[in-house]
């Protein structure tokens, strides 16, 4: 289907407020994948006014309601629409189309509907469904000033950082949320004048959460885009490729979204800094909770671990926790599934064969695989406890489970490395204010909060380094960071022998409304 034909068809539906669309979910789903990217691209372009976009979003959501009398169908169509909008944002973020093209496509859609910017005054405000669709802040413009610094990625006007993560594939929401949080922190400091007059700019490269693509993504950012350093890279198996490359180039590798030990050498690698607690610390906390507070026997605890270095890191943390409690770790049941899949049937079959009843599963998984495992075992093993580490993607996991029904979500535990996003701590309030200002409609999320906190720690060090910025000076400043209080409940510290700022773990559990509630782990 051509772009103009898609525009014509969706215009026909929208203009009639979907009176002819009732029950035709296949047509609407197809159109959602075509009009969604147009809307997503428009949302990242400052030249396209928000009310213009909102009119079409609201109209298409009316189409969804009319076309899907069943709630499950409506949810499915809305998710397709939201994913397509996110894809459109990525197209602009990655430079595949520019805002001139986005404006032209959006204007074609408006003309087909008989709309123009002149008759959009007083339109309806953002609806809750549209609010979930996307950021509105544009990418910062490229610097044009002649650089006075010889440091890579630094000019008189900007400092460029790179992020490699999954912006496509089954884990893409983790990459999007991490980038969102960093961008919110960068936008906040940029509006305050930047760092010594320099604006911070984040450039993304997609590796799809596949290590085979990570090296090319790193090279693209370092060689082609000439970034100063890396912040917020996502994943453990991908970090196994990215970290050696960053070390070879002596490039800063900061605040990655992983708790694996590959980023926690002893003594620390000079160019690698972590904000978050490790997977070993997360799994240690949850094992102690299960044994000491829930009174489970060690043999009643199993591990579902992704079959790669991420899963290995989480499983190693469980084994370490067993040993610390004086328990033999040799008999721990390890179940597995392949990365970027939801193929959990083999793991479930193995669970069925156990002579000792398993009462808890510590999951080292991504949100879709974790949700699929819970879906298929909730009735098979009544009362089974499920725990997850923070990398799972808390919001996405809750959403997936609530689509199945509250009984699938209720009681599922997730350990966190940031405070509750629904709380009122200074750090969380600052984050939510920035998120609301720069990305209106985006809901607070544990992953984007982590990105925001990591970026804020980096910004503090950049300020202290001064205008003559280079990597070595910045790292010296980072290694001298002491008692940095961001309002997280505990001060953050780095040192020459300590490149992990936080060791704090927060416990949370999903309630029957899909919301996270605090859970005392000790």
PLM features: residue spans?
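Compact alpha-helical subdomains of small soluble proteins
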Residues: 53-133, 226
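Signal peptide-proximal N-terminal region
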Residues: 161, 179-201, 324-329
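Extracellular/periplasmic Venus flytrap/periplasmic-binding protein
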Residues: 213-216, 261-262, 269-381, 421-430
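Periplasmic-binding protein-like
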Residues: 221-234, 254-256, 300-305, 356-367, ...
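Extracellular/periplasmic periplasmic-binding protein-like sensory domains
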Residues: 269, 374-452, 506, 516-522
